Every structure is written in C-alpha cells, then in structure tokens.
Amino acid sequence: MPVVKVKENEPFDVALRRFKRSCEKAGVLSEVRRREHYEKPTSERKRKKAAAVKRHAKKLSRDNARRTRLY
C-alpha cells in the first residue's frame, strides 16, 4: 500500500492527489479488480495469450502504417 506523508502547509487535496497517483502507479486498483473473482489458471493463460496476440497485431499495424507514410 502506498504511503504519502503530508507536508507542512500542504492542502489535503494535494496530498490526496499524490496518494491517488501513487496508488495508480503501484497498480493497487487493477490488482483489486483482478482478485475480485477467482479465475481458473487455464482461463487466465488464455486471457493473457489473447492480450499478447492483440498487442502484437497492434504493434505490427503501427509499424506498417509508419512504413507506408515514409515515402
């Protein structure tokens, strides 16, 4: 859990914003959402593999688009 120390004369809103940002960087909310329901190991592998395929296809399409514009 991220810890944020409130500095002297620092408004509460600023400290809260820093805390939210540190939670986002640490991935606390995504971890909570991921652990909310049990996911079987096979479905987890399947989901991760599908995400990797999607990332790879997106990267290839970006590279191809970049090459076609360089004439």
UniProtKB/Swiss-Prot annotation:
Basic and acidic residues bias locations: 34-44, 60-71
Q: What UniProt keywords apply to this chain's record, in alphabetical order?
A: Ribonucleoprotein, Ribosomal protein
Q: Which NCBIfam families match?
A: S21p
**Could you identify this protein by its name?**
Small ribosomal subunit protein bS21
Q: List every stretch annotated Disordered.
A: 34-71
Q: Which domain of life is it from?
A: Bacteria
Member of which family? Belongs to the bacterial ribosomal protein bS21 family.
**One BP term from GO:** translation
InterPro entries assigned to the protein according to its UniProt record, in alphabetical order: Ribosomal_bS21, Ribosomal_bS21_CS, Ribosomal_bS21_sf
HAMAP family under this entry? Ribosomal_bS21
Q: Which organism is it from?
A: Idiomarina loihiensis (strain ATCC BAA-735 / DSM 15497 / L2-TR)
- GO molecular function per UniProt: structural constituent of ribosome
